[in-house]
A protein has these predicted regions:
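Active-site cavity-forming subdomains of large catalytic enzyme subunits
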Residues: 32, 39-105
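Thiamine diphosphate
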Residues: 9-37, 249-257
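Short acidic, glycine/serine/threonine-rich loops at helix termini
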Residues: 10-16, 44-50, 70-72, 78-85, ...
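C-terminal catalytic domains of large/alpha subunits in multi-subunit enzymes
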Residues: 27-35, 62, 87-214, 256-512
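Catalytic phosphate/nucleotide-handling subdomain of diverse soluble enzymes
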Residues: 216-278, 293
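Short loop/turn motifs at secondary-structure junctions and domain boundaries
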Residues: 48-52, 219-220, 368-372
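Short, solvent-exposed aromatic-acidic interface loops
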Residues: 71-80, 243-245, 392-399, 460
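FAD-binding core of FAD-dependent oxidoreductases
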Residues: 3-19, 45, 79-84, 201-211, ...
Length: 512
């Protein structure tokens, strides 16, 4: 399989629905074939997110220290069991560990079949639903205790070095959640805007907050591989099995190689996934590519650099321990002798026993979580029920961002998706189990003009097991808008909403 340039994965490409049909056509006709969905087919034959019903109980001291968390999740997997048992697990696995002071926790789940669309993987993968429930419960706890939601989180969050019993007992090796919390508080002007302000003409503005964590690949399961070689002109070719689905991972992986090899990014050519020639990669899913495949690339580049030094030392008549890799050349320690990369590459192709190529496969025994805090400022028209997010502040700890620009647009896109889940995107079924929202006229996805200012900052930690300290970012960014927007609407209307999306009709009734 030679992967073409595709975009917009978000989990949909993990599940085979109609792909078998063009395969049969090709098999029978011996000719290429493709299947192109209409919008109706895309809306009715693809895999939506799992519908979940959650029950949360919290035990806390009077000063807001959360001592116990009890979460039950009932998940609707639809007509088939695609991803059913795994997504439901993440609803607890990626929410409970945020609260590091809890002395007791329980997570119980059930998955049921229904006569609905078969649910599948979607960005956030169950954590999104669980975080909406747990974070909303914490916001409600703060309200009942008369404590600022920001303050109650300050008192309870997990910190770097803490053991996380609800996260496989893993040590929190890198964490800037405390700094993310403070940054969002300061950037949105929380103290001046919390909880609500009357803007006149029946409109109010309120703020709400939420936190999130995710994973960086699947522990001891995901595999990333890289092959790297130097060409006769001194440039590099990097072959990877990971699929760039619009995330920019080809660029990021090339950056990692270029950093190790101390060369311009343009000197690294990336060859994408081709199952006949690319090294094995288990797939671009579960926020794993930068953390898992990126580490393989880093190790691969280090191995190649050592081989280049060996050949360069031979050309200079020196011991390999007496030379220095200088990016475009190998030099003696005093700099008086020099062999260029082109000379070294040419030498390796004639009478050499050292192949200037390296292949590395990597898998991680841990999955260090990225963290995020988000705060929404929502303007609500109490008469019409219209709610608009006019400002969203976010702070993300994804370790050390390899490419801050790509990380930022990942975050902005995830926030926009989360706001859509909170306010407009809904799926309902008729008596036959057919979805009613079968076009974009009925299924409202927010456009950029529907949302106000989105501002993302990064609070860097350093994850020693990742490439140059990096963790994942792909999924965590969708998780905070749901509880943040819901809490802001509560402050505006004084009514809690426990189902999503929160529609204009519901808000208008609450405002009466």
């Amino acid at each position: 399989v030679a992967k073409p340039r595709i975009g917009g994965g978000f989990g949909a490409k993990q599940t085979s629905v109609c792909e078998v049909y063009p395969a049969f056509v090709t098999w029978k006709t011996k000719k290429p074939s493709k299947i192109i969905y209409t919008r109706f087919e895309s809306q009715t034959a693809s895999t939506p997110r799992h519908e979940m019903e959650m029950h949360v109980r919290l035990g806390a001291t009077k000063d807001g220290i959360v001592r116990g968390i009890d979460l039950y999740t009932l998940s609707n997997t639809g007509a088939y069991g695609e991803h059913g048992p795994t997504t439901v697990g993440l609803s607890g696995h990626k929410s409970i560990p945020l609260y590091g002071k809890a002395e007791a926790f329980r997570f119980v789940s059930d998955v049921v079949y229904t006569n609905h669309m078969s649910a599948g993987a979607y960005r956030g993968y169950g954590a999104t639903q669980g975080l909406f429930a747990v974070e909303s419960a914490v916001n409600e706890l703060a309200d009942k205790l008369g404590i600022d939601p920001f303050v109650i989180r300050q008192r309870n969050i997990v910190h770097e070095g803490d053991v996380m019993p609800a996260y496989y007992g893993q040590v929190n090796t890198s964490c800037a959640l405390d700094r993310c919390l403070q940054a969002v508080h300061d950037n949105i002007g929380w103290d001046e805007k919390y909880p609500v302000r009357d803007m006149g003409n029946g409109k109010v503005r309120a703020v709400g907050m939420g936190m999130a964590m995710q994973g960086s690949g699947i522990t001891s399961v995901d595999v990333g591989s890289a092959s790297l070689k130097i060409n006769d002109d001194g440039f590099y070719t990097l072959s990877i099995g990971a699929a760039d689905m619009g995330t920019g991972c080809d660029t990021i992986l090339a950056q990692i190689a270029a950093e190790v090899l101390d060369c311009p990014l343009d000197n690294v050519t990336v060859l994408g996934a081709d199952t006949d020639s690319s090294p094995y990669d288990s797939g671009s899913y579960a926020s794993s590519t930068t953390y898992v495949t990126g580490k393989a690339v880093e190790q691969c580049a280090e191995q190649l650099k050592q081989k280049i030094c060996q050949v360069g030392a031979g050309l200079l008549g020196l011991d390999a321990r007496a030379v220095v890799f200088a990016g475009d050349a190998v030099t003696s320690e005093d700099g008086t002798q020099r062999a260029t990369l082109a000379q070294i590459a040419a030498a390796s192709q004639c009478g050499s026993n050292t192949a200037l190529e390296a292949v590395v496969t990597h898998s991680s025994e841990i999955s260090p979580p990225p963290f995020m805090v988000g705060a929404a400022e929502v303007e609500v028209d109490l008469e019409t029920g219209e709610a608009q997010v006019i400002r969203y502040e976010a702070a993300v700890d994804c370790g050390t961002p390899v490419n801050p620009n790509l990380a930022r647009v990942q975050a902005e896109g995830g926030i926009l998706q989360g706001i859509g889940m909170a306010l407009t995107e809904n799926v309902t079924y008729d008596d036959r189990g057919m979805p009613q929202e079968n076009s974009l006229m009925q299924y409202k996805i927010p456009a950029r003009n529907d949302i106000g200012h989105i501002h993302v900052v990064f609070e860097s930690s350093y994850e020693g097991t990742g490439p140059f300290g990096a963790k994942s970012i792909g999924e965590v960014v969708i998780n905070t808008p749901l509880p943040a927007v819901a809490d802001a609407i509560y402050h505006a209307t004084h009514k809690r909403f426990y189902e999503l999306p929160i529609t204009r009709e519901q808000i208008a009734l609450a405002g009466q």
